[in-house]
């Protein structure tokens, strides 16, 4: 557990550097948040070759065939997100893992924008490292980095030498933030209370209860997302990033769009006057915004819907956007 996922990825990159030789290759995407890109790109200073898995210019999605063409017998690490924070489509991580492991490469998965919507099973996914931020799961601002036991053995300790054999300290060069870490217990309690509210008392295990809760969350969020997506795809001059229809397990309820008729920050500002909170900008996915041919200074409007939002709120959002944008 560290201060942020960005820092956790940076420390991880440094811990794996000793495995790499001049000419070895790392695959990164231009879809990810910069946290899972920049730290790996910096390793090019040591002769490591960075190969970029690029998004489609129409919708911002990644094509597995393109990854297959990038992976070689020199590939050592593949870095990708389970869900882009602006594209929203769930990437097929199990297939990414299969392709990477075929040549013995490690897989580093960013689950930050995936975590609020889906509870992962890292062993089923088969990833070597998985990271997410606890503020995305309604807790304090911390970053969690998980590594399989075999993958952790390949890391070079980044903390004090006398803690090298302690896995919880191995990739933590600083002391833990005790108060914030203690507060993380509230996340489990919150989701357990959510389960009890909808399902009552249960003899299921904590993990089983969480999965049941997140299945319900996914169904609800897809309904919310489709209210907005159905409007946006029929509105002239609107460009939607990612899929234009939400299916649980395939698309998150994080919807980013660009309006030809009005700057993104103007839309966000106008919505705030109606007490509707959305974001505008590049959301640290600047490379993705640029790849889609958009101006990073303008970026996109991002609507982040989660389980506690309601259909009435999304309907109000749609009506307000419609009143803000000129024309029909």
Annotate each predicted stretch with a short phrase.
Residues 1-328:
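Pyridoxal 5′-phosphate
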């Amino acid at each position: 557990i560290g201060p942020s996922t960005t820092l956790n990825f940076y420390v991880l990159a440094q811990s794996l550097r000793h495995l790499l030789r001049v000419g070895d290759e790392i695959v990164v995407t231009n879809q990810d948040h910069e946290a899972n890109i920049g730290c790996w790109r910096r390793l090019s200073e040591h002769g490591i070759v960075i190969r970029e898995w690029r998004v489609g210019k129409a919708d911002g999605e990644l094509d597995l065939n393109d990854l297959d063409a990038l992976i070689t017998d020199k590939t050592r690490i593949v870095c990708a997100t389970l869900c882009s924070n602006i594209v929203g489509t769930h990437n097929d991580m199990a297939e990414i893992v299969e392709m990477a492991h075929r040549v013995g490469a490690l897989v580093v998965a960013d689950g930050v924008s995936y975590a609020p919507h889906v509870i992962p099973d890292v062993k089923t996914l088969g990833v070597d490292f998985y990271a997410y931020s606890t503020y995305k799961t309604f807790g304090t601002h911390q970053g969690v980095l998980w590594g399989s036991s075999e993958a952790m053995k390949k890391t070079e300790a980044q903390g004090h030498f006398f803690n090298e054999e302690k896995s919880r300290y191995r990739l933590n060069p600083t002391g833990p933030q005790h108060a914030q870490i203690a507060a993380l217990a509230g996340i489990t309690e919150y989701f357990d209370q959510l389960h009890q509210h909808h399902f009552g008392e249960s003899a299921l295990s904590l993990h089983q209860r969480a999965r049941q809760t997140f299945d319900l969350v996914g169904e609800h969020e897809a309904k919310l997302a489709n209210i907005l997506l159905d409007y946006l795809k029929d509105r002239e001059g609107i460009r939607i990033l990612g899929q234009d229809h939400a299916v649980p397990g395939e698309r998150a309820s994080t919807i980013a769009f660009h309006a030809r008729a009005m700057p993104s920050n103007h839309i966000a500002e106008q919505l705030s006057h109606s007490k509707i909170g959305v974001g505008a900008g590049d959301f640290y996915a600047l490379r993705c915004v640029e790849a889609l041919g958009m101006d990073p200074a303008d970026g996109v409007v991002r609507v982040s819907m989660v389980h506690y939002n309601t259909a009435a709120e999304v309907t109000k959002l749609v009506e307000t956007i419609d009143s803000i944008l000129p024309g029909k």
